Each structure stands twice: as C-alpha cells, then as structure tokens.
UniProtKB/Swiss-Prot annotation:
Organism placement in taxonomy: Bacteria, Bacillati, Actinomycetota, Actinomycetes, Pseudonocardiales
Gene Ontology cellular component list: cytoplasm
Protein's UniProt name: Ribonuclease H
Alphabetized Gene3D superfamilies for the sequence: Ribonuclease H-like superfamily/Ribonuclease H
The species this protein was found in: Saccharopolyspora erythraea (strain ATCC 11635 / DSM 40517 / JCM 4748 / NBRC 13426 / NCIMB 8594 / NRRL 2338)
Quaternary structure annotation from Swiss-Prot or TrEMBL: Monomer.
Length: 155
C-alpha cells in the first residue's frame, strides 16, 4: 500500500474533555475527520472527573468508527490519556490492572474499553496537542466538551 493510499484511509480524531469541579458535571467532545468528511460528537455526565471525560472522548470517537480503520490518528491535549496508553497500560495489564504501587488502576473500566476499541483498528498513533493554544480542531473539540458539560449541568 502506498503512503498516499494509506493516508486516504486514515481517520483523525481530535478529542477533549471538560469538567466543572473535579468531580462535577463534565463533558466530552470529538471532531472526527475522514478525508473531506467531518463529524462532531459530544456528551456529558452529571458527576464525573476531567480524566474520565478525556478518556470517554477517545473511546466514543473510536466507537463511532463502525468498521476497522487501517490508521487512526488521535490528537489529545491530555497527558493522562497519552501516557496511560503509550507508557502505563502494558504494565497495568501485566499486573492485573494494578499500578506499580500495587493499587487498583483508577478508571480501569474506561482504560479496558479504550484498549478494546484500539484493538479493533490497525495502527493507532497518538499526538499530544497543547490545549487552549489556538489549534482549530482542538478548540472545536473543547467547545463540544463544554457543550456536553453544560447540558449535563442542566439535567
């Protein structure tokens, strides 16, 4: 497969989470891009944390892909998500979902779901994006996450 054709089969997910208070009402947002097609998604919960919403954004973005994709590029401003998936998860799985300090992994249910969603696709790349720094898609994902949070506050 050529580099050009693999790029055409790639999906970009721009994700963000937002929370008022920690814990408190929170929301997640995703901008999904496949070629020239875009989709925006968001949701929220009445009592959650910022880390749960950051994880949920990635999970929901991947879950929205109804077929396996050869290349998914995930753009997140969450170092928690980025380090969790690229540095910590292998050890957590090896240790039965315990940290190196033998404590249960926080948000293990979401990490397991993320691991499962990642397994449905080919290559997944992770890119950290500085939050609130004018990155257009990250700003859109942030607005969606805030919308989800605001709607959760009202319910």
């Amino acid at each position: 497969m050529t580099q050009h054709s693999s790029a055409q089969n790639a999906v970009d997910l721009y994700t963000d989470g937002a929370c008022s208070g920690n814990p408190g009402p929170g929301g997640w947002g995703v901008v999904l891009r496949y070629g020239h097609h875009e989709r925006e998604m968001y949701g929220g919960e009445t009592a959650t944390t910022n880390n749960k919403m950051e994880l949920t954004a990635v999970i929901e973005g991947l879950a929205a892909l109804t077929r396996p994709v050869p290349l998914v590029r995930i753009h997140t401003d969450s170092t928690y998500v980025l380090k969790g998936i690229t540095e910590w998860m292998r050890g957590w799985k090896r240790n039965g979902w315990l940290t190196s300090a033998k404590q249960p992994v926080k948000n293990a249910d979401l990490w397991r779901r993320l691991d499962q969603e990642c397994g449905r696709h080919g290559e997944i790349t992770w890119e950290w994006v500085k939050g609130h720094a004018g990155h257009p898609e990250n700003e859109r994902a942030d607005k969606l996450a805030c919308k989800g949070r605001d709607e959760a506050k009202k319910s």
